[in-house]
Structures are given as C-alpha cells and as structure tokens.
Amino acid sequence: MASRNKLVVPGVEQALDQFKLEVAQEFGVNLGSDTVARANGSVGGEMTKRLVQQAQSQLNGTTK
C-alpha cells in the first residue's frame, strides 16, 4: 500500500531516513520487513518523540 504521508519540507526525506537509521542503531533494531512490527514501531515512536522535543525547544527559543 502506498504511503499517504506528505512531507511538509521538500527534500527532507534523506535526512529523515538517516535519522531513522541512527535511532534504529541506538535501539539495536535492524529495520526491514523481517523485523517485528513492535521493533520497527519503537523506532518511529522515538523519532516522533525527539522531533516533538526539538520543535518545542525551538518554539521556546532554546536549542539542544
């Protein structure tokens, strides 16, 4: 099934893929179809958590 997610910032896909690989490596997860959904989902959840924290920091005028 095709993904319906649209990226707000054009050209950011490569950076998100790199970010996903970094988080997966930290968690010890090998991304792919042979990995259980729970492990793949944990990577996506952590990415979301970090991106929200980064956005909140930027809105508050602080940077990490």
UniProtKB/Swiss-Prot annotation:
GO terms for molecular function: double-stranded DNA binding. Disulfide bonds: none annotated. It holds the Pfam family SASP. PROSITE patterns: SASP_1, SASP_2. The record marks 22-23 as: Cleavage. GO terms for biological process: DNA topological change; sporulation resulting in formation of a cellular spore. Belongs to the alpha/beta-type SASP family. SASP are bound to spore DNA. They are double-stranded DNA-binding proteins that cause DNA to change to an a-like conformation. They protect the DNA backbone from chemical and enzymatic cleavage and are thus involved in dormant spore's high resistance to UV light. This is Small, acid-soluble spore protein D. It comes from Bacillus subtilis (strain 168). The gene is sspD.
